[in-house]
Design a protein with these regions (language model features):
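Glycine-rich FAD pyrophosphate-binding loop
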Residues: 27-52
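FAD-binding beta-loop-beta segment adjacent to the flavin cofactor pocket
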Residues: 303-333, 451-462, 475-490, 497
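Active-site-proximal substrate-binding core of FAD-dependent oxidoreductases
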Residues: 329-335, 351-394, 508-510, 540
């Protein structure tokens, strides 16, 4: 069966904030110059926003540039931040609010909004379509198409209708060739094609390894008397103080809803640590429980976050394409924000690509646009935030951040680099303390399976496993023997289980549970797991996240 082929001027992989901003900006520039430029966005989720997960406190700077009249246009920014608190939790019972002067200036949220990023992306998609962008949800980009001149010239979407053995079923449809003069990869953190392109074109040369965290989010409905619309709460300390770096958040949206979550850096050392269970017990702290008691959990999700910052940012341009947004790692960890930076990277990419298409150039000169932008300046000023915490721990690293941002106002002359990749950070299980987590009570804390249910997940059961092992032996002979197989604990969805086989223990992969967080691809100590996209349209369907 022959593959269909479609051709465009610009192809964008991923309908998140970076990809949609790029699509809108290309079409805006084409209209300004009275040119016809075709733009296509392909999205692996069942709809735009289905795979979008973020806190999210949103800085409007990029949106102000892209759509100055966004308020009149009905952008879903309904809750302005009106209170900003930071809690230090000293243990499971005690904590206190930090004074404003003790919090890095970058964490202040005056003028920002609490939003659903999924809903913002849905709104941006409608604006893109109004501008003439073609958007195709439910199609996963499987691999980049690279020609004989080593130029990226599009992507091949995944085949549909293969059974678990890779054989064609009655409904088989081959993937489609989507070809373009320029392809922008906006897959989010640890994008599977982006990862391949970084390696193929050596884009991370002289850069530090990218660093990641896993971010959890639950959406709750709470009683009106506990709701304080516009309140932003960030937390540090317990439960992560001694085992990992990271932090917590609780945001009061409209409609008596709160978003609560925990961010756990993936450079933690103890293989017995379970980020999911840390999140569940976090909600029992009295300073957090006060907001959630008598409430109802209505949604759950988790996603990897690329947080290495400026020192980890790869070269983003190559022949025929660009990496943008979290696919490259444009998040500003000093602000705990990545949406406005992802959007700006997409807009800069659009300007570079528009120039290249107009001039019939092979390479879009993104780097020049980037270095002349406020995005470059912002990421440069925040360059030592994540690496400082990774190198020196939460207290010394946090003190360095205070010095750089509150005293030196982002003008520090030194660089702090972290050369140690996250997957190499685990120590042996025999040298680690086991962690006994409390059983979930079904009121504030929950188990993995009931949580995954609230992600509205769907995968076709009879399809090839999208979680690929380079070696079937490593999970038992190395990971289980040395690290008590940490995949059982770092996965937030119960995908990986150790079961007793006929002769020895085996790793069972429950691929249908996967919520596409990419943590296994990042944290596996042997780098034995590769996350690949399942059939298009599969995965979580986040409604308001």
């Amino acid at each position: 069966m022959e593959r269909d082929c479609m051709e465009f001027d610009v192809l964008i992989v991923g309908a998140g904030p970076a990809g949609l901003s790029a699509a809108c900006r290309v079409k805006q520039l084409a209209m300004e110059k009275d040119q016809e430029i075709s733009v296509c966005v392909v999205e692996k989720g069942s709809e735009v926003g289905a795979h979008i997960l973020s806190g999210a406190v949103f800085e409007t700077r990029s949106l102000d540039e892209l759509f100055p009249d966004w308020e009149a246009m009905g952008a879903p920014l309904n809750t302005k931040v009106n209170q900003d608190k930071t809690y230090y939790l000293s243990n499971e019972l005690n904590g206190h609010e930090l004074p404003t002067w003790a919090v890095p200036n970058t964490l202040h949220n005056d003028g920002n909004y609490i939003i659903s990023l999924g809903n913002l992306c849905r709104w941006m998609a409608s604006q893109a379509e109004n501008l003439g962008v073609e958007i195709y949800p439910g199609f996963s980009a499987n691999r980049a198409i690279i020609d004989e001149q080593n130029r990226v010239c599009g992507v091949l979407t995944g085949d549909m209708g293969l059974d678990k053995n890779g054989e064609q079923k009655a409904n088989y449809e081959p993937g489609i060739e989507l070809r373009a003069k320029f392809t922008l990869f906006a897959e989010g953190a640890r994008g599977h094609i982006g990862k391949q392109l970084i390696n193929k074109f050596n884009l991370a040369e002289d850069k530090t390894p990218q660093h990641y965290a896993i971010g959890f989010k639950e959406l709750w409905e709470i009683p009106a008397e506990q709701h304080q619309q516009g309140l932003v709460v960030h937390g540090l300390g317990w439960p992560l103080a001694n085992e990992a770096s990271g932090g917590s958040y609780l945001y009061h949206l409209e409609g008596n809803q709160v978003a609560v979550g925990l961010i756990v850096d993936l450079n933690y050392e103890n293989p017995h640590l379970s980020p999911f269970d840390e999140f569940q017990r976090f909600k029992h702290h009295p300073m957090i429980e006060q907001y959630l008691q008598n409430g109802k959990r209505i949604s759950y999700g988790a996603r990897a976050i690329a947080k290495g910052g400026f020192h980890s940012l790869p070269t983003q341009q190559f022949a025929g394409g660009l990496l943008i947004g979290c696919d490259a790692g444009t998040l500003n960890s000093a602000k705990i924000k990545g949406t406005h930076t992802a959007m700006k990277s997409g807009m800069l990419a659009a300007e570079a690509v528009f120039e290249a298409v107009s001039n019939q150039s092979v390479i879009a000169d993104y780097q020049s646009h980037f270095k002349q932008s406020w995005l470059y300046e912002e990421l440069y000023q925040a360059r030592n935030f994540s690496s400082g915490i990774h190198r020196f721990g939460s207290w010394l690293g946090g003190g360095l951040a205070m010095l750089e941002h509150n005293v030196l106002k982002g003008k520090a002359k030194w660089n702090v680099r972290c050369e140690h990749p996250d997957h190499q950070s685990l120590i042996l299980a025999e040298n680690s303390d086991e962690i006994l987590y409390p059983k979930p009570d079904g009121v504030l804390s929950f188990d993995r399976l009931s949580s995954v249910y609230l992600s509205n997940i769907f995968h076709e059961e009879d399809q090839p496993c999208h979680l690929q092992l380079a070696s079937q032996r490593i999970p038992i002979e190395q990971n289980l023997a040395l690290y008590a197989e940490p995949a059982q604990r770092y996965c937030p969805a119960g995908v990986y289980e150790i079961v007793e086989g006929a002769e020895q223990a085996e790793l069972q992969i429950n691929a249908a549970n996967c919520i596409h967080c990419k943590t296994c691809d990042i944290k596996d100590p042997s780098q034995n797991i590769t996350w690949t996209p399942p059939e298009g349209g599969g995965g979580p369907n986040y409604p308001n996240m």
